[in-house]
């Protein structure tokens, strides 16, 4: 609230419109893209095991928090583990190197984004492994992991600019 220059009540009201995770009492936001609740997308940073809602979320959090991270997520088509090492500046390692990320553009309001978009944003071992899935989701694009990171780097830079850590 202080950073945004908004009253606390208005900030909480805005956050309640987003698809966040709240504690059992409903008074504390505990997840908004990054969470302690297990998902397919394991996100390790500073030795802490966290999770992201979407494959795409995992790609930009290192930039937002200013720290390197390791992503581990299964290929949705084959179940094979994909591992990605990221820094705020770029992709350091991808295993397998052929891994791609599916991307969809939400046609929904922000409160529905997790349900509507995250299920369609996944990691795949390769474009070939994703071919059957993509045939069922023609609206989705497949991008190599490094290309997705660079795309997010530009977007994050435009949105947050010099407010980013580091």
Predicted feature locations:
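Aromatic- and glycine-enriched beta-alpha-beta binding-site module
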Residues: 30-81
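Residue-level detector of family-conserved "landmark" positions at structurally sensitive sites
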Residues: 9-11, 25, 72
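Residue-identity detector for threonine
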Residues: 11, 27, 35, 39, ...
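Short amphipathic alpha-helical interaction segments
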Residues: 3-18
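Intrinsically disordered, low-complexity regions
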Residues: 6, 27, 32-34, 48, ...
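Intrinsically disordered, low-complexity segments enriched in polar/charged residues with Gly/Pro
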Residues: 7, 27-30, 58-60, 110
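Long, low-complexity, charge-rich intrinsically disordered regions
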Residues: 70, 80-166
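A short, conserved structural fragment
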Residues: 16-27
